[in-house]
Swiss-Prot record:
InterPro entries: Kelch-typ_b-propeller, Kelch_1, KLHDC10. Belongs to the KLHDC10 family. The gene is KLHDC10. Kelch repeats lie at residues 87-154, 155-198, 199-260, 261-319, 320-364, 365-403. Substrate-recognition component of a Cul2-RING (CRL2) E3 ubiquitin-protein ligase complex of the DesCEND (destruction via C-end degrons) pathway, which recognizes a C-degron located at the extreme C-terminus of target proteins, leading to their ubiquitination and degradation. The C-degron recognized by the DesCEND pathway is usually a motif of less than ten residues and can be present in full-length proteins, truncated proteins or proteolytically cleaved forms. It holds the Pfam family Kelch_4. This is Kelch domain-containing protein 10. Residues 1-57 are annotated as: Disordered. One of its GO terms (molecular function) is ubiquitin-like ligase-substrate adaptor activity. Residues 401-442 are annotated as: Interaction with CUL2. One of its GO terms (cellular component) is cytoplasm. Pathway: Protein modification; protein ubiquitination. Disulfide bonds: none annotated. It is found in: Nucleus; Cytoplasm. It comes from Homo sapiens (Human).
């Protein structure tokens, strides 16, 4: 078999560059608790307008909160809270985000609307070459000034958080598929500095729309597209030796997962699970999922169990996925016909699908989502209207587990004393706050 035949067996050519940030581009475009405490917080969406970072001490008149109820899912909507001339991150799609206890970090993105994307002030239009953080305790958006070289592949890259470091791999610039990346860029969020990770071995192809995870000290990258060719390749980067290896599973080609992009992955330490994804012309089912066994170096096909009354989740791509222990949550996405607004949970021990009672306030795809260590998921941005090619800058949060007593008390404290972050560390210690909580204020 020739090298070209081997390439074609694992990849398929499309008719045009795959979209990296939504419609209008390319052919396709914890701690949980027990008992009843805090159950009112569970599976309820809250929309967060967020305050921009404002220098100085200007007083701001806050508008009252309005409550709306959609079916059985109450949603708190907070109206525009901004001074004229200030705003949070513009609407975008194709970006990525991660979260720790203190901040949501949002990187990159795409918006072809000239005015929405910043107009003449955005040198990288229609992309966003910027890093934002949303501070949970104060509700403040802040665009981070960083040193070093920030990557220019700003749509459909992969992003993970490793300690204080953001690891970015792949992605595409404009036009989609014409300026892809295959480097690993690292940003230390404490020191606000970017660096290029020097690696050995054969790197993956220049791709975007791949999925990535860190497992046992190694970075695993699966799938993706060049814009025209879709991949089933699986690569591993040892973060200690910084050496890339392309894994060659012990499977026949017919037993490999279908080539895809804009899928998501989950893992349990032994297997990597591939969830959804597709190509410009299809979206893959979630009835059966492929799993790569790290111990046997082989792909396995796993039949999942449907919801008793509803069945399986719809096939989708461009969705989001977060994981809490052995529970995986997917939300939103696009099935080739409609934008989805549902949320599903898959248990990696039973492989049972459960549909959550909450519905996303805005069905969306090409959005990003991240979950905090305490189990609160944040969803930002994405495409909300295919025909109008419309994006959103909305930020929502939803508790996926019952919040701990500490988290409930913390949220009550922040609501009662919104200026708590303005106090000195000494004052906060005198009030009885722990060092851990004080760090979450800074």
């Amino acid at each position: 078999m020739s090298a070209a035949q081997g390439w074609d067996r694992n990849r398929r050519r499309g008719g045009g560059a795959a979209g990296a940030g939504g419609g209008g581009s390319g052919a396709g475009g914890g701690s949980g608790g027990s008992g009843g405490r805090g159950t009112g917080q569970l599976n309820r969406f809250v929309q967060l307008s967020g305050r921009p970072h404002l220098p100085g001490k200007k007083k701001i008149r806050w508008d009252p909160v309005r409550r709306r109820f959609i079916q059985s899912c109450p949603i708190i909507r907070i109206p525009n809270r901004f001074l004229r001339g200030h705003r949070p991150p513009p609407a975008r799609s194709g970006h990525r985000c991660v979260a720790d206890n203190t901040n949501l970090y949002v990187f990159g993105g795409y918006n072809p609307d000239y005015d929405e994307s910043g107009g003449p002030d955005n040198e990288d239009y229609p992309l966003f070459r910027e890093l934002w953080r949303y501070h949970f305790a104060t509700g403040v958006w802040h665009q981070m000034g960083t040193d070093g070289y920030m990557p220019r592949e700003l749509a459909s890259m992969s992003l993970v958080l490793h300690g204080n470091n953001l690891l970015v791999f792949g992605g595409t610039g404009i036009p989609f598929g014409e300026s892809n990346g295959n480097d690993v860029h690292v940003c230390n969020v404490k020191y606000k500095r970017w660096a290029l990770l020097s690696c050995r071995g054969k790197k993956p192809s220049r791709i975007y729309g791949q999925a990535m995870a860190i497992i046992n000290g190694s970075l695993y990258v699966f799938g993706g597209t060049t814009g025209y060719i879709y991949s089933t390749d699986l690569h591993k980067l040892d973060l200690n030796t910084r050496e890339w290896t392309q894994l060659k599973p012990n499977n026949l080609s017919c037993d490999l997962p279908e080539e895809r992009y804009r899928h998501e992955i989950a893992h349990d330490g032994q297997r990597i699970y591939i969830l959804g994804g597709g190509t410009s012309w299809t979206a893959y089912s979630l009835n059966k999922i492929h799993a790569y066994n790290l111990e046997t170096n082989a792909w396995e096909e796993i039949a999942t169990k449907p919801h008793e009354k509803i069945g399986f989740p719809a096939a989708r791509r461009c969705h989001s996925c977060v994981q809490i222990k052995n529970d995986v949550f997917i939300c939103g996405g696009y099935n080739g016909e409609v934008i989805l607004g549902d949320i599903w949970k898959l248990n990696l021990q039973t492989f049972q699908w459960v549909k959550l009672p909450a519905t996303m306030p805005e069905p969306v795809y090409f959005h990003c989502a991240a979950v905090t260590p305490a189990g609160c998921m944040y969803i930002h941005g994405g495409v909300v209207n295919i025909h109008e090619n419309k994006r959103t800058g909305s930020l929502f949060k939803i508790w996926l587990v019952v919040p701990s007593l500490l988290e409930l008390a913390w949220e009550k404290l922040l609501a009662a004393f919104p200026n708590l972050a303005n106090l000195s560390r000494t004052q906060l210690l005198h009030l009885g706050l722990t060092q851990g909580l004080i760090e979450r204020l800074k």
